[in-house]
Amino acid sequence: MKKLSPSLKIYILLVLVLALSNAFQAYFQVYQSFMPPAELPAPPLVLALANAGIAIFLYGGLGYIGLKLSGRLGFAAIWESDVTNRQRFVVPALIGAICGVFLIISDLIFSPFNSIGRFVHPLFPSSILASVSAGIGEEIIFRLFFIPFWVWLISIILRGRRQNQVFWIISKISALAFALGHLPSLMILYGFKSVGDISPVLIIEIILLNGIISMLAAYYMRKFGFLAAAGIHFWTDIVWHVIWGIAQVIL
């Protein structure tokens, strides 16, 4: 039997952490701390198992495909031997913290004009689990799977030419998809009936803030591996959702 690589072992661990985090949030309904109350479609245990299954099979499966394709494209592996722990953990944490501060400042600037005021955040400590799930799950879908898949597919069509340009184009599309992917939850949270009800200023804010984080995550994933991308996202959310969320409650 072929021995699992360190990168694959870490990936499996990340998927299991995602599954546990999602299951815990579903079982204890932590999202109701900041979302409008709604009747559960199934018992909490069923929801927890369903969320864990989605994380393992859907997220895990798509991420595994992306993991294999990223290796073919020359992206850094999750546990690339040439990547230092400083590049893999420390620098992404610092970048994430800076991005979190940037989101806070932007929130204060945009809030008088975006029609909803300041963004609401999950209550502590559920905000930590939300940060874990976003840092792993959203990065698996929008970075680890989306970018390598489309770069690989287009590279076949172009026979390997202009791969760097293709990477940046796909990264921008991924960033836009990631930003717009927040609109459905935003509509539920603030009671918008359609996308047309959302203020253009708010849409610009969402695209700008999420887009910057997405582009940084894409670059660091290719250069230093998936852990770097997940780290940027996770530490951004820790500052933005956890620390700023607590500060807003206190202040």
Predicted regions and their residues:
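Alpha-helical transmembrane segments of polytopic membrane proteins
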Residues: V46-Y59, L202-I207
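Membrane-water interface of transmembrane alpha-helices
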Residues: G61-L73, F146-F149
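Juxtamembrane helix-loop-helix connectors linking adjacent transmembrane helices
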Residues: A38-E39, L45-V46, S70-G137, V151-R161
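Membrane-interfacial helical/loop segments at transmembrane boundaries in membrane proteins
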Residues: Y31-P41, N114-H121, F192-E205, L251
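Transmembrane helix-loop-helix hairpins at the membrane interface
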Residues: P125-L251
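Alpha-helical transmembrane segments and their helix-start/interface "positive-inside/aromatic belt" motifs
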Residues: M1-V15, A48-A52, V83-L94, L227-I232
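Alpha-helical transmembrane segments of multi-pass membrane proteins
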Residues: L14-F34, G63, L67, L103-I109
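Alpha-helical transmembrane segments
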Residues: L8-N22, P92-C99, S171-A177
